Amino acid sequence: MGIEGVLERGVVTTTADKLINWARTGSLWPMTFGLACCAVEMMHAGASRYDMDRFGVIFRPSPRQSDVMIVAGTLVNKMAPALRKVYDQMSEPRWVISMGSCANGGGYYHYSYSVVRGCDRIVPVDIYVPGCPPTAEALLYGIIQLQNKIKRNYTIAR
């Protein structure tokens, strides 16, 4: 039975988990945490060419209004406490996307004394987007992967 049969009867059945996860995937509000050149690609992805609004992705300036953090660029030791503080201010459920080689593992500056070798040492990361810098298409693919991950979550305890 296709959608036509469902619309004739006027009844759609689903589980509460699927309904909640569908709503969450359609309204991701990322907090921009741009630290270096990857932030330029993140801004490029938010522009009109890629139109992330069609996925329900609206960039928010405040951690209290967002549920996704995109860490884009080189994370240094001085910035690590600020990253953790912003992450703690986000409400549950929250997700983190690590964008670029520097955020993933230190990148080109891996052996520098002041660079954190991956933001996953400070906050739990859900999606890694590789590249130096990753393209806007790669970030868009990472957001789609995050939406797929959210769809597989169980919200209601069984």
Swiss-Prot record:
Its main location: membrane. It catalyses: a quinone + NADH + 5 H(+)(in) = a quinol + NAD(+) + 4 H(+)(out). One of its GO terms (cellular component) is plasma membrane. It comes from the Bacteria. NDH-1 shuttles electrons from NADH, via FMN and iron-sulfur (Fe-S) centers, to quinones in the respiratory chain. Couples the redox reaction to proton translocation (for every two electrons transferred, four hydrogen ions are translocated across the cytoplasmic membrane), and thus conserves the redox energy in a proton gradient. HAMAP family: NDH1_NuoB (MF_01356). NCBIfam families: nuoB_fam, PRK06411.1. This is NADH-quinone oxidoreductase subunit B 2.
